[in-house]
């Protein structure tokens, strides 16, 4: 009796920088030696979209080339569509988001469309990882690290069903240190809004730059990246402040 051929690995890629962004294209190219790669990503830059879904208009999906789909929607829309419609009869083994054009450290994860795309994969039951390059130069380095993570997962599955957030320093591969497991750091409040006038004299506002690092000590993702190490942070979706439950219960019962 003949052995059944092993099912090839299948990976869904998404991002928040857009379907034609350098990061996702470099990652796809690196992973195609390992797996069938399907890209489902926004038609334009949707950075900062977080976990938003498009609810009041339809999603327009265009196949721009083989196994590459452009979606007029958010990163979360993209993964939701891919897993609940496009690939529902043959789900991917992994959902990877990125490579993001810039860091997703500390509080950034609450706003990040890159992390949100991976989180949607996690919600829908697929092991998911977000990758971000702390810069905009060495995408090949980040793609190589991502491939190594996938290869290690194939050899020995990731020992947690948590969503993983991985940041890679913007350095040549040979200058990178090892990978370290970290916790999220934190930033100060974002800087003030920037007010300007449009050509017609109307006031317009831009969001100010993100705040500087506040909690960036040893063990945080900020510190690890600063030291030239790759940072990997397991994230959980449960936002319950469990240590506060008893105190809140007592407060409510006090007369």
Curated annotation (Swiss-Prot):
Gene3D superfamilies named among the record's database cross-references: Survival protein SurE-like phosphatase/nucleotidase
Stored SUPFAM superfamilies: SurE-like (SSF64167)
Residues binding a divalent metal cation, per UniProt: 16-17, 47, 100
Record text on cofactor binding: Binds 1 divalent metal cation per subunit.
GO annotation, cellular component aspect: cytoplasm
Keywords tagged on the record: Cytoplasm, Hydrolase, Metal-binding, Nucleotide-binding
Catalytic activity from the UniProt record: a ribonucleoside 5'-phosphate + H2O = a ribonucleoside + phosphate
Cofactor(s) needed: a divalent metal cation
GO molecular function annotation: 3'-nucleotidase activity; 5'-nucleotidase activity; exopolyphosphatase activity; metal ion binding; nucleotide binding
Enzymatic class: hydrolase
A Pfam match: SurE
Function: Nucleotidase that shows phosphatase activity on nucleoside 5'-monophosphates.
Family membership noted in the UniProt record: Belongs to the SurE nucleotidase family.
Name under which the protein is recorded: 5'-nucleotidase SurE
Species assigned in the record: Vibrio vulnificus (strain YJ016)
